[in-house]
UniProtKB/Swiss-Prot annotation:
Protein location: Cytoplasmic vesicle membrane; Golgi apparatus membrane; Mitochondrion membrane; Preautophagosomal structure membrane
Gene for this chain: ATG27
Function: Effector of VPS34 phosphatidylinositol 3-phosphate kinase signaling. Regulates the cytoplasm to vacuole transport (Cvt) vesicle formation. Plays a role in ATG protein retrieval from the pre-autophagosomal structure (PAS) and is especially required for autophagy-dependent cycling of ATG9.
GO molecular function term, any single one: phosphatidylinositol-3-phosphate binding
Transmembrane feature ranges: 176-196
Lumenal-side segments: 20-175
UniProt keyword annotation of Hydrolase present: no
Keyword Mitochondrion in annotation: yes
Protein name: Autophagy-related protein 27
Predominant cellular place of this UniProt entry's protein: membrane
Domain (MRH) ranges: 20-168
Keyword tags: Autophagy, Cytoplasmic vesicle, Disulfide bond, Golgi apparatus, Membrane, Mitochondrion, Protein transport, Signal, Transmembrane, Transmembrane helix, Transport
Gene Ontology CC terms: clathrin-coated vesicle; cytoplasmic vesicle membrane; Golgi membrane; mitochondrial membrane; phagophore assembly site membrane; trans-Golgi network; vacuolar membrane
Biological process, per Gene Ontology: cytoplasm to vacuole targeting by the Cvt pathway; pexophagy; protein localization to phagophore assembly site; vesicle organization
Amino acid sequence: MKYVRCVLLTGALFNIAAGLKCADSKVLSRYKVSQHAAKGKFTESTPPSETTDFWWINLCEEHSEPVPDKCKDDAMFCHRQQVKLDDGKEYVTQVFDVPRNQEVDVEELRDGFQVSFTGKWGERERKVKVRYTCADDKAEDEVSAEGAFGAHTTPVEVALRGPSGCIQATEKSSGIGGWITWLVIYAVLLTLIYLLAKSYMSVGHGSMQDFREEFVERSTNLVSSLPEFAKEVMGKVVGGGPSSRGGYSAV
């Protein structure tokens, strides 16, 4: 069963259980996160070896993408650490993945949003925080991790910068255009209510046929007068109306 729990923080905080369908989230549905999966790779020299961390996150169940090697099939988040020795041999030393049935907290921020969840790594529970920010000039999300994964007492903090943290195009376009649309809708509704009320008052206790004829006549008169009204308004706006000048004119 899915549910949403709201808490007042910097933004709105939502708790979502079961597989995360982003379209059902009030916050996540506004962003492009359901269209992308993020992955990152970081290599560090750790003599006598070389250590590489692989990060992968596919937050929304709407987006389908193969899970990386060594990660569980039902993972929505996975971190894999791999060590390459100086003889060229490679070993996977750590795998930490979080299944889709984990609860996910979503917090909307001023410059994006943050998700947090908890997964089990061996006998320990690890808290993960992933922060999304928008970079609409990038085709894929860039992943960076803050702090060492081996610090078991601190949360795993991952930062994603890319298209996933950007608001949907329909959300951006709603502004002045949206207000104009609503104003037109309200104007039409108020006009319709006015015509119905005036028609009803005119016929009094007359028949339904009388009311319909009165309503049609008033509506027709209103529609036929609109072009002349619009022409008069445009004339006032463009021409500024007739100007008067005092004094005598030369003959």
